[in-house]
Structure formats: C-alpha cells, structure tokens
From Swiss-Prot:
This is Alpha- and gamma-adaptin-binding protein p34. It comes from the Eukaryota. Pfam families: Adaptin_binding (PF10199). GO terms for biological process: protein transport. InterPro entries: Alpha/Gamma-adaptin-bd_p34. Keywords: Cytoplasm, Phosphoprotein, Protein transport, Transport. GO terms for cellular component: cytosol; nuclear speck. PANTHER family: ALPHA- AND GAMMA-ADAPTIN-BINDING PROTEIN P34.
Length: 316
C-alpha cells in the first residue's frame, strides 16, 4: 500500500458475500486490479475518484478480519463499509465486534450494507436503530421497496448510494478543480464534527458512570470548565451521525455548476434533510435547524462573524 494514500476499509461479516465482491460492485467491474500484500489476506483496490468538484486517489481496502488491521491501515482509514447477513438474527453481532475499531478511526463515512432487510432475520427497524445508535448509514443493495417512479426527488439506493457517499467525503489528499474549491474549503472543519462529538463523549464518560441505555444520538450535557467544557460547547444538543455527510453534500451541490442534474440533486437533498428534521420534537427540530444553518454557512465560505450569536433562543 502506498504511504499516505487514504482508504475506505471494506469488510464482510457474511459467509456468502465477500468484501471483494462488494468492492467489485463499487468499481463496476469483475476484473478489478488487486494489489496483494505479502500475507495475501488484506487486499488493496486502487480507485481514482474523479468528479466535477475534485479528484482523489484512494484504496478500497478489503480486510477479512479485524485482527488483520495493521497500524498503517488504521491510520489511513477515512471510510468504513461493512456487509452483513440480514437473514440471520445474529447478523449484527459480528458487525458489532468491529465497533471498537470503528470508533477509534472516527471515519466520516460509515455504511452498513446488506442485500435487503429481512423480517425473519434483521428487519428494517432493527437495522436502522443499530445504525442510528452507532453512526452508520444503512444501504440495501437490492431493496424490496424502490423509490416511486413519479417521485420528483428519488433517493439513491444500492451500490449507487455507496459510491455517492464515498464521492461526498472530503479525502485527505483531495485535489480541487478550479473554482470548485470555495465550497469545500471549510468542509474539513465540518468533517471534524464527529471527532468533536467523540471527544465530548469521552470526556463526559470519564466524569460520569455510563448509562447502559445511553445512545450516541442522545443530548450531550454541557460542561462549563476544563477540556470537556470546551469540547461540549462545540457541539449542539442534538447529534445526528449522518448530519455531517448531509451538509458536505449540500455544500458541494450549492457551490457546483448550475446544470440540471446538480439542481435536481440539490432539491432532493434539501427534501431529505427536511423530512429527517420533521421527525424530531419541536425543540430538537429548532436546534437541528440551527446547527445545519451554521455549519452550512461555514461550508460555503460564509464569514463566521456574521453568524456569531445566532441561537434558537434569540429574540427576533
């Protein structure tokens, strides 16, 4: 593996669907070039992400077992894609064994993949609750329910959604294209939101016994002194694991070209975020909207001074 090349770590917890097959779906080829390691256990698939905003050289790194993750691989992980067998009631148990590593990597893109949810194994509600708790996005390769044909803003599904999410990530070696860079110039600060959340949670857990029912999506208590206080102040009460990715994509669409495809995707993303916010209680919805507004303003190059003091408690 070339030094300094970021990677999307891909693994499978299914005996019938390998990580290599998933990578081949992502690359759109059954004849992908494989760079074998000396042990021939971990495999690297070089991939050039080249879109209208940027280009980046990354590796799709297939790791069959968590015990094969070396320090070099761990340092390069910027996305994590894991496949599981939804037909087994214990299908998520093997995935959960990867969580300590995933939490240490703090990857901005984490995707849980299956062929489709299964009522006799892991159903949709179980899969989505697990994803919300641990900060993953659920993607079904062959969902039973496809977007309606007359839907003006159909959501991407399957492999297309995985590719879309990987394209929306801000890779460490990204090379921006011409004037596209403005909207991405501050996305690295947005991409650090998950790291700030993790830091705040870590500080809080050291001061208080963790509750067995606590979830990552619960409100983070604020602290008014010490390192934990500064970390807690950097995040809002509502922590949505997918919010950073949504804002990254929204910012890239806003600062992109004015073509029809870009315009349609922009409205589709706005609709997705609106629908997501609509499920929150009123007070949480206000805080959610405030966080999105602030982060999005910074993402497109807005002046921080112009939004200082902006709060849902302000009187207008």
């Amino acid at each position: 593996m070339a030094a300094g090349v970021p990677c999307a770590l891909v693994t499978s917890c299914s005996a019938t669907f390998t990580g290599d097959r998933l990578v081949q779906h992502i690359l759109g080829t059954e004849d992908a070039v494989v760079e074998a390691t000396s042990s021939d256990a971990v495999r690297f698939y070089p991939w050039t992400i080249d879109n209208k905003y940027y280009s980046a050289e990354i590796n799709l790194c297939v790791v069959p077992s968590k015990f094969l993750v070396t320090a070099e691989i761990a340092e390069s992980v910027q996305a994590f894609v894991v496949y599981f067998d939804s037909t087994q009631k214990s299908g998520l148990d093997s995935v959960s064994s990867w969580l300590p590593l995933a939490e240490a990597w703090l990857a901005e893109v984490m995707i849980l993949v299956c062929d489709r949810v299964c009522d006799d194994g892991i159903n949709r509600q179980q899969a989505q609750e697990w994803c919300i708790k641990h900060g993953f996005e659920l993607v079904e390769l062959n969902p039973e329910e496809l977007p309606e044909e007359d839907d003006d803003f159909p959501e991407s599904t399957g492999v297309k959604r995985i590719v879309q999410a990987l394209n929306a990530n801000v890779w460490s070696n990204v090379v921006m294209k011409s004037d596209r860079s403005q909207g991405f110039s501050l996305l690295n600060s947005l991409a650090g939101a998950n790291r700030r959340v993790a830091s705040a949670e870590s500080c809080h857990s050291e001061q208080q016994e963790p509750s067995p029912t606590a979830e990552r999506t619960e409100s983070l208590p604020g602290h008014h002194s010490g390192a934990c206080g500064s970390a807690g102040a950097q995040v809002d009460s509502i922590v949505d694991p997918m919010l950073d990715l949504d804002i990254q994509e929204l910012a890239s669409l806003t600062t992109g070209g004015g073509d029809l495809e870009n315009f349609e995707r922009l409205f589709s993303k706005l609709k997705e975020m609106k629908d997501k916010a609509a499920t929150l209680p009123h007070e949480q919805r206000k805080l959610h909207a405030e966080k999105v507004a602030k982060a999005f303003w910074m993402a497109i190059g807005g002046d921080r001074d112009e939004i200082e003091g902006l709060s849902s408690d302000d009187e207008h």
